[in-house]
Amino acid sequence: MSALVIAIDAMGGDFGPRSIVQACIASLSATPSLHLTLVGQPSLLEELIASHPAVDRARLTVTAASETIGMDEKPAAALRGKPDSSMRVALELLRDGKVQACVSAGNTGALMALSRYVLKTLPGIDRPAMVAAIPTQKGYCQLLDLGANVDCSAEHLFQFAVMGSVAAEALGVARPRVALLNIGTEDIKGNQQVKLAATLLQGARGLNYVGFIEGDGLYRGEADVVVCDGFVGNILLKSSEGLATMIATRIEALFRQNLVSRMVGALALPLMRRLQADLAPARHNGASFLGLQGIVVKSHGSAGVEGFQSAIARALIEIQENLPQRLHGRLEDLLP
């Protein structure tokens, strides 16, 4: 099996490189063909790696970068003022063909700005979009955009729909059902951008557009791809994560209330743990930047070891499915 090589921005995220290094070592154990390049401060990274003496150093290398982009740093400042940041160096490794994907838990705005500057977008795409898998009653739905583009035109929403459809196909969904997130399913509902995007999608050949969808329809699994602007998508994603955590916490509290509830809880514990694992945000961590000339996956800044592993796993799937090339081919067919 040929090697799968990924660059890791080891200095990004809320918790620093320790949990990232742990996630990388766990990913190497799970995937024998995986090779990782950690980008960041060599002395710090080598010290962290040394605490895992069993790791195969032939598959885990370190590339030096002297600067780190802060989580609250403005994208423009990061783009102009930090040419040797771990994030930028990781993206340049991807641009130069030394790795096949880049994963970062760093500043989202800076990652998007640097990705567009270093990698460029695919022909026909104005703006990349962030997409992630959301659990539904019937499986998963690809939701985009998740915050990269707060204000979107109808044309941008149309491009997101095309990219989301291709991504879903790459993940094994035949003729993905594509829907626009809206405040109602009737044609008269929604703002002007959503209505115009619907008109564009209705006329798109080769795209399985099923109309508008409301938030509850998303969770019922009524579409495989749901499209919205980044303002709405980011709120929906974080609300979903918060709701899942709240439900799990409330159920655990109910099972601890008295002796009877504790007995019932003990019987239900295996099922509850399975449900919690299914809905846990860490399991679904990893948002892809679609529309770039390269694979970039954004991990949640607060992701721990398991969450960062999930982001690496998403990058692996996209490498194996040759996603940017597939996108490029389908975009030529679908975009006007």
Swiss-Prot record:
EC assignment: 2.3.1.274
Pathway connected to this protein: Lipid metabolism; phospholipid metabolism
Subcellular location: Cytoplasm
One Pfam family matching this protein: FA_synthesis
Catalytic activity entry: a fatty acyl-[ACP] + phosphate = an acyl phosphate + holo-[ACP]
GO molecular function, one term: phosphate:acyl-[acyl carrier protein] acyltransferase activity
Domain of life (superkingdom): Bacteria
One Gene Ontology CC term in the entry: cytoplasm
Keywords from the named record: Cytoplasm, Lipid biosynthesis, Lipid metabolism, Phospholipid biosynthesis, Phospholipid metabolism, Transferase
Main location: cytoplasm
GO biological process, one term: phospholipid biosynthetic process
InterPro entries in UniProt: FA_synthesis, Phospholipid_synth_PlsX-like
The protein's role, per its UniProt record: Catalyzes the reversible formation of acyl-phosphate (acyl-PO(4)) from acyl-[acyl-carrier-protein] (acyl-ACP). This enzyme utilizes acyl-ACP as fatty acyl donor, but not acyl-CoA.
Subunit structure: Homodimer. Probably interacts with PlsY.
UniProt similarity note: Belongs to the PlsX family.
Official protein name in the record: Phosphate acyltransferase
Underlying gene: plsX
